[in-house]
Amino acid sequence: MERYYQKEIECASQEQIKAWQDERLVRQVRHVWDKVPYYRAKMEEKGVTPEDIHGRDDLYKLPFLSKADLRDAYPFGLLAEPLEKCVRIHSTSGTTGKRVVAFYTKEDIDLWNDCCARALAAAGAGPEDVCQVAYGYGLFTGGFGLNGGSQKLGCLTLPM
């Protein structure tokens, strides 16, 4: 049986997927340039501006963040949205130093749940299924995403 959650995404052509990726990368780079001074400074160090990024072929131009960068920016230095738009925080335990934190907006969570729902649908899950989510529900985001994704599919969800 064919099963889809978001058929227009799941059945998109390679050309369409690449076009979406290029469009979203350009938009995201502009967003972090405008909203995240820490990352903007990293881009400026490399001599890169949003105008230099036209799509996936330009990824090599962008600076990558290390775990040290994530720690240096702790806790709010990489926020791309105002704190009042954030609805969830996940964090590492900090056993090797400062915690690494990730803040999520409602839109972030919806996108993650949709991504997990597409993966589960591709595996054949649907409303008649019980989905046991054996990932932890602690600081790791996996359990929450699969929980939300299985619920979006209408599965009976069993968190462990």
Residue map of PLM features:
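Nucleotide 5′-phosphate-binding alpha/beta core
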Residues: 1-91, 96-114, 118-122, 126-128
